[in-house]
C-alpha cells in the first residue's frame, strides 16, 4: 500500500468515525426525547380509549371534537397539512416538517380516539417523529441531507415507542419513502433510536405488540397453494382499502368545501353507523378485535365495515393513522378465510395482517420483519410467501400518495412514478 492509498484510507476511516459518533449522539437524543414523547402519547391514547369505553356518550361529542381539530389546524396555518405525505415529501425533496405539527397531531389524534373516531396511531407517530426529528436537525444546524436522516430517525423512534417493534420501525422509515430504494445512510441512527425508544416505552410499562399463533400447519404443496390463493385476496383487499380511503376523501372535498361542515358530517356519519350496525367494534383503533381474530373466525363483513368506518373518519378530517386499521382489515379477513380453507385461524390472521400492510405500504422487508417481531419465527415461511405475492399483486397503490415507485415491481426497470 503506497502513501497516497494509505492517506485516502485514513481519511475515509476518520470520516467514518466522525460520522459514527455524530449519529450515536443524535440517536441517543432522538431515542430518549422522541421515544419519551411517543411513550407518553401511547399512554394517553390508552387512557382516552378507556374513557370512551367507560362513557359511551362521548361518541356524541365527535362532531364537536372535529370542530376543535379544524380550528386548531386553521389557527396555526396548517389547514392544508397532508399528514404522513408531508413527512415523506420532506425526505424526498427537502421540504420542512414544522415542529408545531407534533403537538397538533397528538391533540387531534387524542380527540379523535376519545370520541370514537375509527383511526390508528402509527400514522400520527410518523408525523410526530418526523416533525421532532426535523426540529432537532434545525437545532443542530444540519444540512439538507442530514436533515433527511434526522426525520427518518425521529420516525423510527416514535413508531417504535408506540408499536414496540424496533427493527420493523427502523426499516420502515427507510423503506417507505421510495419503493425499490433503501436509505441505508440512515440505518445506524434509525436502529439505535428505535431500540432506545422501545426501551423507554418498556420502562414505562408499555408492552410490545405481540400476538400468539397457537397452531402452525405443515408447509405442504396443498397448504402452500391455499396460502397463494389467500394472498391474491389479501392483495385485492389492499387495493380496495387504498381506493376506499382515497376515494372517500375525494368525495368529501369535491362536494363539501367548508372543512367545518365536512368534519361535522363525518362525525355524524360515524355516530349513525355505530347505531345502524349496532356495535362499537369499529370505533377507535380496534386492537381488541384484532386480538380476537386470532382466536375465533370473524364474519365476512367485519373487514369491510372497518374500511368504511376508517374512510368516513379520516376522509372527513379527523386525525390518527391508517396502519392499525390496515392491520385490523388484514387480520379479520385472514380470520374469516381460515375455516373456508381449513387452516388455523391465528396463522391466517397473522398472514393477513402483514400481507395487507405490505400491499398498502409497498414495504415487503418491513412487513416480514414485523411478522417475526409480532408472531415469532415459526410463521415466517407462510408470512413471507403471502407478503411477496401481496407486494407483487397490489400494483402501485399506496396509503401515501407522495410515495415514489422508483423501481418497477415487475421488471428490473427504473420508472420513478407516484403511487395511486
What are these regions (language model features)?
Residues 1-420:
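Alpha-helical transmembrane segments and immediately membrane-proximal extracytoplasmic
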